[in-house]
Every structure is written in structure tokens, then in C-alpha cells.
Amino acid sequence: MNKRTYAGISEQYAKIDTSKIVLIPVPYDGTSTWQKGADKGPEAFLNASENMELYDIETDSEVYKNGIYLSEAVTENSSPEKMVAAVHAVTKTFIRKNKFVTIFGGEHSVSIGTIRAFNECFNDLTVVQIDAHADLRKEYNGSSCNHACTAYEASQNTNLVQVGIRSMDILEKSVMDPDKIFFAHEMAIDDYWMENAIDLMGKNVFITFDLDAFDPSLMPSTGTPEPGGLLWYETLDFLKKIFKEKNVVGFDIMELCPNEKDKSSDFLAAKLYYKMLSYKFDNTEEADYGNESGFKEPNNKISKFEDEEYD
């Protein structure tokens, strides 16, 4: 991945010392089981971002002026477990620098590392998983760090709220919390699903967004597309409500599997990322991601996992 700034913004808004936002690319596709190519997702996303207008009409803002630092990509791919450990370490390093940390993958197994880092750094974390798949397997193909296992650890260690689910294995029913999972077919006839989902969330929220949550008519370029998904404006409405009512401490976007002949999905992913930032900073009077936002002091929290520093 060539060294560049996010969306081609000037260096003035891209320095680590002055940027409030950090973007970590993770071009990993080691455990996907159908369409390959999610490792090309971050590059396609960044290319699309460079061709996007940076003024957001809805919020009347230019969120990039808060500073967006594009970090070096996490390229560890020797094993799923080592990739997760590397993502965990890099994410945690930037959280401790008091940045609003965002991650773009890559297949959804990447989120095991990001969720682990945020859970160690923020009190009473709610993980909002927007996804077509439940991803609640404890292990798949010999690894607990498979993309089919993305939400298992979160289901055990955080307040997990799942939205848009329309594909799962019957064994995952024994793991899921039926009161905190919103199936797509039920959402389609429930005018209050957004409010009901938000009522289940605590103060501190991390959003993990698998792009296959969208209907494939809107987002065909993903590893495992499923019919019956979310549409653009209902998704934005839901996200806007979360950012307004909760303290979103970070987010990731996963599973862009770019198609050389159709760039529309790349552009949608780029717009989604920028929209989420615009909502976050539209609702933040003074950006403080430290103790007042539920941040755990590093010396008060013993890591539950092997801790590596990636500076």
C-alpha cells in the first residue's frame, strides 16, 4: 500500500500529533471461505476516498479538519491468531494516545482484535454488530480467529447487540442472546427496531460494521452477500441515532471485496466511513476520549491477552 494521506487531505490535517482521528488499514483475507479479495478492500476504499467531496451536506461540516491520521497498514498474515494480536496491539496503542480510532479491513476476523482492544480500554462496552451473519461460532476451520467467529468473544465479554442478521448456523442459537439480536426479516415489519436496539446499548459503544449488512443490490462487492439487507438511508438513520444518543468510542468497517469493473461499492464504503465520522464529530462539542468518556486508565487494567506495543 503506497504511503499517502486519507482522502488526499493536506499534511496539515494528517499529522499524528494534531489529528483527533486515526485510521488503521488492515488488508487481511486469510480465513474467508467464499469470495476472496477483502485484502484489497483498504486500498480500494482509500482510492475511492480520494475522489469524494469532503463537505458533508447533512451535517454542514468538513470533518477531516479535525485531523485524520492514516497509520501504517497492519500486514501481519502468518496466522489468524498473529493477525488478531497485531491488530489488538496497534489499536490499543492509538487508543492510549487519546485518539478516536477507526479500522478498515479486511475480512471480519480483523474485528476480533479491535473489539478486544476497545473492551480493555473502555468501561461497560457495548458492541453493536451490523452484519448479515451472526458470526457466533466459537471455532471454525480449526481457529477461534476465523471470520465466522468474529462476535463470539464479544458475546462472552461485552454487551453485544446484533443488527441485520439473516444467516447463521443452528448451533449459534445456543450462543446468541435472543433479546439482543435483530433479525432482518423481523426488522422489515417493526417500525421501532432502531429505538429498541438503542435501548439495549450502554453508554460506551463500539460499532463493527460488516458491509454485507447492506442489501447486495446496494453493496454487491463483499465476500458473502446475502439478500434482504439494509438500505442506505435507513442505515444512516440508525447510525445517526446511535452517535447522537451514545458515546461511540470507535468503529470498524469490514469485508469490502472490490470489483475492478464496478467501483460503486468502493465509493459506498468511502461515504459510509466519512458519514460515520461526520455524525461522531457533529455530536462532540469537545473531543475528549479519555476518562470522561469511560476510558480505563492503562495502569488500572491488566490485559486479559498478550500485550504487544506497535509504535
Put a short name on every predicted segment.
Residues 2-311:
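Conserved alpha-helical scaffold segments that buttress catalytic/binding sites
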